[in-house]
């Protein structure tokens, strides 16, 4: 059957809303750049043309650095591919692949928010649930020794799911039993999770001889998600796991 008008409109909204969010963010960022760049003021004091030139140069320079850091330098990527040097190729593509690594927990967090929306709940507590899930997974990842990877890695993932799930259970229970609004409760629990994680990383879970840096002990190799490339690229299987779960949620 032909797609319905409502279905087409929904698909357009799915594409349009994120695009508008990105454009709005870029515009707001550009305004902040202009308001905080001395060269722009100096240019307009000279002439309107000089000011507009300074506006373009400032925004282009800032966003050029932003996109190069997030996606890599296209020229360097092409040169690296033609050079055939494996290390140079890894270095050239590392910014883009690192962005995928960083995006992985955000994909999971977004799915958690989406599921709450589908259930009619406004879950602002995903940040705190992410903190507690990561803390639980980290503890299992470094505290358990001598386990094979086939057991240790899934166990760490399970610990993360349980940690985040239990933290999300608290506002759910409060809403069911007392009628407490999930928005208020989850916002407060976000701060509790943040402060608790900060205390743990500066105390019981702090890496020995870290020089006061709030960082956990090194996670056992058996608990780490497999990586596809050598150093300095950290790109790992978790990104494709996130995409797979996103497809399941959509389905």
Across the structure, where does each feature detected by a protein language model lie?
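Residue-level signature of transmembrane alpha-helical entry/exit and packing/kink sites
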Residues: 10, 14-18, 22, 94, ...
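Hydrophobic core segments of alpha-helical transmembrane domains in multi-pass membrane transport
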Residues: 17-34, 109-113, 134, 138-140, ...
